[in-house]
C-alpha cells in the first residue's frame, strides 16, 4: 500500500515539474521582448517605477516585477523583457499548481466515491 502511494506521489510530482519546465520553455520561446498590446505596458511601467497600476492593480506582481527589472542591470530597454520573463514563469507555475490541484481533487472524489483501499 505504501509503495503504491509513494509511487503515485513521485509520478505526480515529476509530472507537475515536467509540465512546469515544458510550459516555461514554450513561454520563453514565444516571449515578447518589448511591450505588447493592452495592459502590458502599464504593468511593465508600474513595475519599473514601482507605481500603482490602474485599480484594482496587482501589488504583489508589481513588487515582484520590480525585483525582476533589477536584473536588467540598469538597462531600461531590457526592463520589458525581464517583466515578460517573470510573467512567463508565473504562468508556468500556475500550470504546475493547476495540475496538482486537479489531481488532488480528482483523487479525493475518486477515493470518497469508491473507497478504494489501494490508494
Spans of features found by a protein language model:
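Juxtamembrane helix-capping/reentrant segments at transmembrane boundaries
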Residues: 48-49
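Transmembrane-helix motifs of polytopic, lipid-linked glycan transferases
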Residues: 17, 85-114
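Extracytoplasmic catalytic/substrate-binding loops of multi-pass membrane glycan-assembly enzymes
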Residues: 31-43, 53-65, 81
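Transmembrane and membrane-interface helices of multi-pass
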Residues: 21, 115-119
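Membrane-embedded glycan-lipid processing machinery
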Residues: 68, 79-89
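Short, Lys/Arg-rich, polar N-terminal cytosolic tail immediately upstream
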Residues: 1-10
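Membrane-water interface at transmembrane helix exits
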Residues: 26, 31, 65, 69, ...
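Transmembrane signal-anchor helices characteristic of membrane glycosylation enzymes that use polyprenol
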Residues: 9-37
Amino acid at each position: 500500500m505504501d509503495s503504491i502511494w509513494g509511487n503515485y506521489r513521485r509520478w505526480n510530482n515529476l509530472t507537475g515539474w515536467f509540465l512546469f519546465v515544458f510550459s516555461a520553455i514554450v513561454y520563453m520561446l514565444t516571449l515578447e521582448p518589448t511591450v505588447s498590446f493592452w495592459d502590458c505596458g502599464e504593468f511593465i511601467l508600474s513595475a519599473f517605477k514601482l507605481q500603482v497600476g490602474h485599480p484594482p492593480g496587482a501589488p504583489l506582481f508589481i513588487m515582484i516585477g520590480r525585483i525582476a527589472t533589477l536584473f536588467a542591470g540598469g538597462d531600461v530597454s531590457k526592463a520589458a523583457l525581464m517583466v515578460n520573463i517573470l510573467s512567463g514563469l508565473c504562468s508556468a507555475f500556475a500550470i504546475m499548481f493547476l495540475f496538482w490541484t486537479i489531481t488532488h481533487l480528482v483523487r479525493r472524489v475518486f477515493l470518497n466515491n469508491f473507497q478504494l483501499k489501494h490508494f
